[in-house]
Every structure is written in structure tokens, then in C-alpha cells.
Amino acid sequence: VAEVTDTARMRMFYGDKVVVDLSRAFIDSAGAKHWSKATIGAVEDRDPFFRDVPGKNLKERMFANLQDPNVTCQKGLIEMFDSTIGRSTVLMPFGGELQATETQVSVQKLPVKGYTDTASMMAFGFNPDLCEWSPYHGAAYSFIEACSKVVAAGGHWETMRFSCQEYFERMTADPKVWGKPTAALLGALKMQKELGLASIGGKDSMSGSFETESGTIHVPPTLIAFGITPVNAGNVISPELKWEGDRLYLVKHTPLADRMPDTEQLKR
């Protein structure tokens, strides 16, 4: 599609006519530099891990929680897509006798010639309530959640690599608005450094503001961590209970005093 030359210029032609002629130095500059002031605001002094669910008793609270849009099943949406394309799927989106247990990771065998048990395992992490309370904490726990899902499915967090999806309200001249993505990126960077795991960057969007009849609404500060790692397909653990008497284990995590993840505890 192109010929590499020693002119240090990128030239594009339409027929014999030059339509683009840019210097390599200009391309390397990545465009004009932009500067903005950012102010990271204080967070509300409350326990972000406790969410008040309405109901007089446990049964009512359970049903109320299941009606939360962030908890409800997305089976109808998932079934609109063919999860078997490519014949590489190791775990179907839903497992169990009734196919009602949702899988928390995506496991796909690598498309190589012949047979292989080598697969990729990918999971995402994001808590909108936590990110709304503090983008810094929310971004940090996005990485922890992605790692937790991979470990629960039989993968190794130590070999994970990440890419992020960011989504924030429309940026203005207000330093507090710029403080939200700044805080989220700092939280993400802190987790990557403490866990020793790298990210290749990600996709960002700063257009999450919408005009309605009652005014402008904004998306909550959003940083979703997508983590992927190689895995042997034979070692993958599906989430459904296999036999009567199977045990479920809770690996409890105690946050630090500032409510950030205790990565040293989690590593153990």
C-alpha cells in the first residue's frame, strides 16, 4: 500500500497528483499541545461499599436488588449475538443444566492450524456506584475486579495485560470537570504499578453529556479495565455448581484506611 523512502515525508497521490505532503517531524509531534487545569475534588465521607437497598426483610431486599439495572440479567441481549463464531469458544455465555449461570470471563482458543489447548481469557472490571463516588477509587477497583474474575476462572493474574475504556461527561473549562478523568487515570496507574501489570492504553470518550427537557445529564465517571491473559483451556473453571454439596468460598478483602485496595493482601 505504500513505498518507504528516505525523504522523511509522507506523500499521498491521487493518480499523478500529490494530495498530501507532510513532514515526518510534523507527524511525530502528534498535533498541537493542549493544556488544561484539573482540580480533584474531595469525596463524600461515607462507606462506598455499602449500598442501601429498600425492603422490610431479606427477601424484599433481594428482589429489589435483582431489579437494579446493574444486576439484572442481560441474557436477551447476549442471545442476539452468536458466541460460537470462529469455533473457538471454550465457555458459553451461560452454563449449567438450565443455561442460567452467567459466565464472568471470555475464553477463546487461539486460531492456529491444527489442535491447541492454548486460549485467551479476558474479563472486565467496573463498578458505576464506586466510580461515581470517587473516580480514583473506582478506576483502581476496576483492575482488581478484572483480576478477581480471571483468578476465579482458573487464570493467573500475574500474566494479565490491560486495555481501558474511559467515558466521561463533556469537558469544559471547569477544572473540576477535568479532575474526574485525571483522578481516574491516577487510580488506574497506581494499580498497574502496585500489581506490576501493564496497559496498552485504551479508548476514551469525553462526550457523555446529553440534553433533555429537564436539563443536562452526564454519564457517571467511567473507567472500565479489560484484562487478558493466556490460559490452558483444560484448566478453565466454569461458574456453575457441578455437584450437590459443592462449596462456595469467599476470599475477603480488607481495604486500606483510605478505602483503596490492599494489593499486598490481595497478592497473597
Question: Where are the predicted features?
Answer:
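Glycine/proline-enriched, intrinsically flexible loops and inter-domain linkers
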Residues: 1-268
